[in-house]
């Protein structure tokens, strides 16, 4: 994440609880996305004013997206207006192993940095993987 992240106001305890989000991982040729509702914003590793801004997500290892996380250095976390809840519900209930669920959900994938995101997102965090367990 860049320093622009620090210039905006967020409700770190509410953002994942009250808004719907999707993680997108991969590159233009092969990528996947899934609905995420467990996560947090925070900071780690650094002196005051120099810590790293972080997004922490919890993805079940059986999810197809988890395979992409293993092989990727970057990912995006995108937040959407409520009008996209039906599309996001589709992402959360269908597997990208079996279909192009992003297209079938009516969303538009776009390149963001070294990974992918969504044109329809109202806010997207471009993230670098720090740790995966």
Protein language model annotation of sequence segments:
Residues 1-133:
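Active-site-proximal mixed secondary-structure blocks
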């Amino acid at each position: 994440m860049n320093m622009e992240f620090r210039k905006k106001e967020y409700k770190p305890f509410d953002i994942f609880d009250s808004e719907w989000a999707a993680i997108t991982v991969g590159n233009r040729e092969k990528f996947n996305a899934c609905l995420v509702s467990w996560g947090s914003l925070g900071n780690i590793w650094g002196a005051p004013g120099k810590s790293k801004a972080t997004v922490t997500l919890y993805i079940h290892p059986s999810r197809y997206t988890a395979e992409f996380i293993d092989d990727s250095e970057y990912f995006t976390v995108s937040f959407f207006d409520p009008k996209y809840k039906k599309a996001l519900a589709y992402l959360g209930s269908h597997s990208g192993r079996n279909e192009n669920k992003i297209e079938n959900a009516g969303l538009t994938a776009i390149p963001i940095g070294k990974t992918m995101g969504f044109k329809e997102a109202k806010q997207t965090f471009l993230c670098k993987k720090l740790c995966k367990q």
